[in-house]
């Protein structure tokens, strides 16, 4: 769709996924710090691991995690992604088409699938797991709130340097937060980079993600506080998580 749209308009366009990925990675790293997890010793499961956001997260985390498990609908596509990631000589790369089997032993889950309904049974997730759900609609059911022993948060959200009002409800918890994809367009304009920056699956390199993260920080766009739905995950909630979770 990106290529079709680009051919129909005379202005640069971007999916916004590079900055979304940057905020996902920042969220995972911060959650690891809060939960006392060592990312270098962790198994990371990426639901929707062959998609644009999922594959970009995998490329960056391949240099930070111990094991990465990619899930997807098509085994052939998964095998291609596995081969590309394995060539980076980083984390061990595994693949599966079964989401619930994959999450059983996960230390960290990045849920980035395109799905109309939740794709993971939260009862399969072990205590102490960090879950970053960047899917819209959400990959993880909001009924997961009954699991006070797992750290589930909405991924890909950014702060804004000034309250953001589009005149209608964006479904965000407060006006000081914006979707990462929206933020990317604003950041690129502020940097005067009028180009097709994020342009489709497989083209989001770790270098591009890092550049937009630093440009965003320069202009006041950084990782948003942790939320799940409209509920802020505050220090008290994190203390409860730590008391109930098995931390590795």
Functional labels for PLM-detected ranges:
Residues 1-40, 166-175, 179, 183, ...:
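Glycine/serine-rich phosphate-binding loop and adjoining beta1-alpha1 elements at the start
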């Amino acid at each position: 769709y990106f290529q079709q749209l680009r051919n129909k308009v005379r202005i640069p366009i971007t999916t916004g996924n590079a900055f979304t990925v940057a905020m996902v990675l920042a969220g995972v790293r911060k959650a690891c710090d809060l939960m006392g997890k060592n990312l270098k010793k962790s198994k990371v499961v990426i639901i929707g691991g062959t998609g644009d956001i999922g594959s970009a997260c995998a490329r960056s985390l391949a240099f930070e995690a111990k094991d990465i498990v990619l899930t997807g609908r098509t085994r052939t596509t998964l095998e291609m992604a596995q081969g590309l990631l394995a060539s980076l000589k980083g984390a061990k790369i595994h693949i599966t088409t079964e989401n619930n089997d994959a999450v059983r032993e996960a230390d960290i889950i990045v849920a980035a699938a395109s799905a109309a309904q939740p794709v993971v049974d939260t009862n399969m997730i072990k205590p102490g797991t960090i879950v970053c759900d960047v899917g819209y609609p959400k990959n993880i059911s909001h009924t997961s709130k009954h699991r006070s022993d797992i750290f589930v948060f909405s991924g890909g959200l950014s702060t804004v340097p000034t309250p953001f009002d589009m005149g209608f409800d964006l479904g965000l918890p407060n006006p000081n937060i914006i979707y990462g994809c929206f933020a990317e367009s604003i950041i690129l304009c502020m940097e005067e980079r009028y180009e097709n920056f994020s342009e489709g699956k497989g083209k989001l390199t770790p270098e591009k993600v890092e550049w937009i993260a630093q440009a965003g920080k320069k202009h006041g766009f950084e990782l948003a506080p942790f939320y799940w739905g409209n509920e802020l995950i505050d220090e008290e909630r994190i203390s409860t998580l730590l008391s109930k979770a098995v931390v590795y």
